[in-house]
Design a protein with these regions (language model features):
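Phosphate-group recognition and catalysis centered on beta-loop-alpha active-site segments
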Residues: 2-275
Length: 275
C-alpha cells in the first residue's frame, strides 16, 4: 500500500504537468501577431480615458495593436469597458450587464466627453492596421452568448484579431464552435490574488488545469507572475505567451527577450521612455 501511495505522487505531478502544457502549437494566425505590441485598453493618457474611442484611434494611428475588454449589455450589445461596475470609470452605481445600450450610451468616461464605446465602433479603426486582442468579460454564465455576439461582430470587419479570457468556458466554446480563431488563456497567481474565490478554483486557475480541455494557442500572464513554475513549463514545451501590463522600458525589453507579446501602457515607444 505504501508503494502505491508513493507512486501516486509522481503520477499526479505528471498529470498536472500534462494538463498545464497541453495547448495548440501550430495555429497559423500567430504569425500575424507575434511581433505586435498591444496598447493596453488603447493608448490612453491624461485627457484620453482607457478603452475610449480616442485611445483606440491613437493606438491605430501609432501602428500598435490594441487590447480591449468586452461586456454584454442587458439588451445584448457589446460594450468596450474593463469593469462591470461602472463607478470607477463613469461615477455611477450600476453594472454594464444591467443597463441597455441606450442607457450606457448616455454615460461618459472619467468626466470627459468620451462615451463608453461599443465593439462595432472600435473594430473598423483597425482594419488594415494592427490586430486586436479582445478579452471576453463573462458575468452570470453569459459566456456562450458573449462569445457568439463578439464573433458575429468581428466577422463583419476586416481587422485581424485574437480572443482571450480568464474564463476557460470561453476558450472551450471557441474550440468547439470557432476552432480557427486564435485563443488565449489569461492567468495570474490566483493563490496570491484570488480574493473571493475558493481555494480549489484559485489552484485550478493558477495551474491552468483546463488547458488540457480548452487547448489555448497562448497564455497571457501578469508580468509580476512571469516566473510561476507552471508557466515556465508551458514555455519550455513550446507554449506561446503574452505578458501584461508592461509599464516601463525595462519591462518591455525583458518581455520581448522572453519572446512574449507585450501588452503595455504609459510607454513612449518612439523614445523608449515611460510616461
Amino acid at each position: 500500500m505504501k508503494v502505491w501511495k508513493a507512486a501516486l505522487i509522481p503520477a499526479g505531478a505528471c498529470a498536472l504537468t500534462w494538463l498545464t502544457i497541453h495547448g495548440r502549437r501550430d495555429h497559423p494566425g500567430w504569425g500575424k501577431i507575434e511581433h505586435t505590441r498591444f496598447a493596453h485598453r488603447g493608448l490612453h493618457c491624461s485627457g484620453v480615458p482607457e478603452n475610449s474611442l480616442a485611445a483606440f484611434r491613437l493606438a491605430a494611428e501609432a501602428g500598435c495593436g490594441a487590447e480591449l475588454d468586452v461586456h454584454l449589455t442587458a439588451d445584448g450589445y457589446l460594450a468596450v469597458i474593463h469593469d462591470s461596475d461602472l463607478f470607477r470609470m463613469c461615477g455611477v452605481e450600476a453594472r454594464v450587464e444591467d443597463l441597455t445600450a441606450a442607457q450606457l450610451g448616455k454615460l461618459r468616461l472619467e468626466g470627459s466627453g468620451e462615451p463608453v464605446p461599443f465593439l462595432e465602433q472600435v473594430v473598423p479603426l483597425f482594419e488594415g492596421r494592427g490586430p486586436l486582442l479582445v478579452e471576453l468579460k463573462c458575468t452570470g454564465g453569459n459566456h456562450a452568448k458573449l462569445c457568439e455576439k463578439t464573433l458575429e461582430c468581428l466577422d463583419r470587419f476586416g481587422a485581424d484579431y485574437c480572443i482571450e479570457s480568464f474564463d476557460p468556458r470561453c476558450l472551450l466554446w471557441l474550440r468547439r464552435n470557432r476552432p480557427e480563431v486564435l485563443r488565449g488563456q489569461l492567468t495570474q497567481d490566483f493563490l496570491r490574488r484570488g480574493e473571493g474565490q475558493s481555494v480549489r478554483n484559485r489552484l485550478a486557475l493558477t495551474a491552468m488545469l483546463c488547458n488540457g480541455l480548452t487547448r489555448p494557442d497562448f497564455v497571457a500572464c501578469r508580468y509580476q507572475d512571469r516566473r510561476m513554475p507552471l508557466l515556465g513549463l508551458w514555455r519550455l514545451w513550446g507554449g506561446r505567451t503574452a505578458l501584461w501590463t508592461i509599464r516601463t522600458p525595462d519591462e518591455l525589453a525583458e518581455t520581448e527577450r522572453l519572446g512574449a507579446l507585450a501588452i503595455f501602457e504609459n510607454i513612449d515607444l518612439e523614445k523608449g521612455e515611460g510616461k
